[in-house]
């Protein structure tokens, strides 16, 4: 009799995921835009946005997924994320000064723990990241080629200190700043968009492939216009490494392709540098790295920061001087201002601020997350692990962005800049969540590999 009863179709409240993802990404990409064009985005409003996003996620998972909080499984990578949060709390001398950063970090860790229970949320948050980034790409191109509009309508909205820096960057150095208050921040937006655009190319369907290639080239062009040489070099490096791992074929053939792409890019950038001042500026900054001019500091003062960080580490090698204390102490070595300065090398700053103990925990997170992601990508490339098209795109984005983040840690401050660390935690959550969703299949693959290797011996 039951088979004749029409059961009501289960309603999914996917809109909750979309709203939550939008708010989370809006919170990192556009909070500063709100303060410039709409209203002052205080810490309270930031927390309210995040709190509402988390509440929506909890409502979705507890209703649609029937998830009980006390039954949530925590994966090894997620434990490491929690430990890094504890390192911040334990080593912070003044919790009030770092409260906003720590709360945002904690919220992201909690979301990573939750989101593995619905793979669709991976896809939604990825497309929100891509869409938010493209807003900045469009603004970057528009304002670069229409400087009069930028100076008349966007530039006046910044405060006097920001305007002084922006005037020099836009009018003298020809950097594309877009909607950001510094060309460095805009370069980060471009790099994140570049990693996302690159991942789209790996969809099995070749539909709209020309549009996807064009999108990648447009975003790359916008990144070059920002003049951020480190971000440009590391993002291209991340794409090439991801290409080698995720593209089928012989390694030698892939290496030849990579070398061809690099040489072609160099020639195109060189040719365009004669016609576009922003590209000329970027090209000059890159070639300056290989200059033999002894009076030129190619590090832009980074070597001095490295020496200061190392000396602080030697003063307290086990526990460090305290989370974000380097930024406060280093101003004693500079006379011009009291602006917070990071070491422009995350690894050195971690040693300096959290000591060997905290450094070891962060490095464990970095290494375990990238190893897990590479292994997943390799299995997917060999068709051992069956992933949907959208999930594979998310995985490749996770790989590409993690490589970029870790490489940029050498000369930048991605762990301390909200835009970069936000997306990094999400990227780690992507790979950890994909592993969780397919763990039985992965364990079966690993057993087959082990048995096969024993048989060969």
What are the roles of these predicted feature ranges?
Residues 1-65, 84-91, 405-407, 426:
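N-terminal signal-anchor transmembrane segment
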Residues 17-27, 211-217, 345, 374-411, ...:
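Loop-to-helix entry and N-terminal half of a specific, functionally important transmembrane alpha helix
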Residues 29, 290-354:
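Long extracytoplasmic/lumenal interhelical loops at the membrane interface
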Residues 54-57, 236, 240, 394-457:
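Transmembrane alpha-helices of multi-pass inner-membrane enzymes
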Residues 57, 85-86, 126-160, 164-172, ...:
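Alpha-helical transmembrane segments of multi-pass inner-membrane proteins
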Residues 76-77, 240-244, 354-404, 440:
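Hydrophobic transmembrane alpha-helices and their immediate junctions
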Residues 78-82, 95-117, 123-133:
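Aromatic-anchored transmembrane helix interface
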Residues 138, 144-147, 243-293, 310-315, ...:
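A membrane-periplasm/extracellular boundary helix in multi-pass inner-membrane enzymes
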């Amino acid at each position: 009799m039951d088979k004749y009863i029409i059961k009501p179709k289960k309603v999914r409240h996917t809109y909750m995921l979309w709203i939550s993802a939008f708010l989370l990404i809006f919170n990192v990409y556009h909070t500063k835009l709100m303060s410039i064009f709409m209203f002052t985005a205080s810490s309270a409003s930031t927390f309210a946005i995040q709190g509402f996003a988390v509440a929506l996620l909890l409502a979705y998972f507890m209703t649609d997924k029937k998830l009980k909080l006390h039954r949530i499984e925590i994966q090894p990578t997620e434990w490491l994320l929690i430990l890094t949060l504890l390192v911040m709390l334990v080593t912070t001398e003044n919790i009030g000064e770092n409260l906003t950063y720590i709360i945002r970090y904690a919220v992201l860790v909690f979301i990573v723990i939750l989101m593995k229970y619905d793979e669709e949320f991976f896809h939604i948050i990825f497309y929100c990241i891509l869409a938010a980034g493209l807003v900045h790409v469009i603004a970057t191109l528009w304002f670069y080629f229409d400087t009069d509009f930028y100076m008349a309508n966007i530039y006046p909205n910044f405060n006097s200190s920001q305007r002084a820096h922006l005037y020099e960057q836009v009018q003298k150095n020809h950097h594309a700043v877009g909607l950001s208050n510094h060309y460095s921040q805009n370069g980060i937006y471009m790099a994140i968009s570049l990693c996302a655009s690159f991942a789209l190319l790996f969809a099995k369907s070749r539909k709209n492939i020309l549009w996807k290639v064009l999108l990648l080239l447009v975003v790359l062009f916008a990144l070059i216009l920002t003049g951020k040489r480190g971000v440009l070099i590391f993002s291209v490096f991340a794409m090439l490494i991801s290409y080698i791992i995720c593209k089928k074929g012989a390694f030698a053939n892939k290496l030849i392709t990579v070398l061809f792409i690099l040489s072609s890019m160099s020639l195109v950038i060189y040719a365009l540098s004669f016609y576009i001042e922003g590209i000329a500026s970027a090209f000059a900054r890159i070639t300056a790295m290989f200059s033999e001019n002894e009076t030129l500091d190619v590090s832009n003062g980074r070597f001095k920061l490295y020496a200061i960080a190392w000396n602080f580490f030697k003063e307290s090698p086990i526990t460090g001087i305290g989370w974000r204390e380097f930024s406060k102490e280093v101003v004693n070595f500079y006379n011009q201002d009291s602006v917070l300065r990071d070491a422009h090398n995350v690894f050195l700053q971690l040693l300096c601020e959290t000591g060997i103990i905290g450094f070891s925990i962060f490095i464990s997170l970095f290494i375990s997350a990238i190893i897990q992601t590479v292994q997943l990508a390799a299995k997917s490339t060999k068709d051992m692990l069956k992933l949907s098209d959208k999930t594979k795109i998310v995985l490749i984005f996770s790989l590409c962005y993690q490589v970029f983040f870790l490489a940029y840690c050498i000369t930048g401050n991605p762990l301390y800049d909200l835009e970069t660390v936000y997306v990094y935690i999400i990227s780690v959550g992507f790979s950890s969540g994909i592993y969780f969703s397919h763990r039985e299949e992965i364990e079966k693959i690993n057993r087959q590999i082990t048995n096969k290797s024993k048989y060969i011996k």
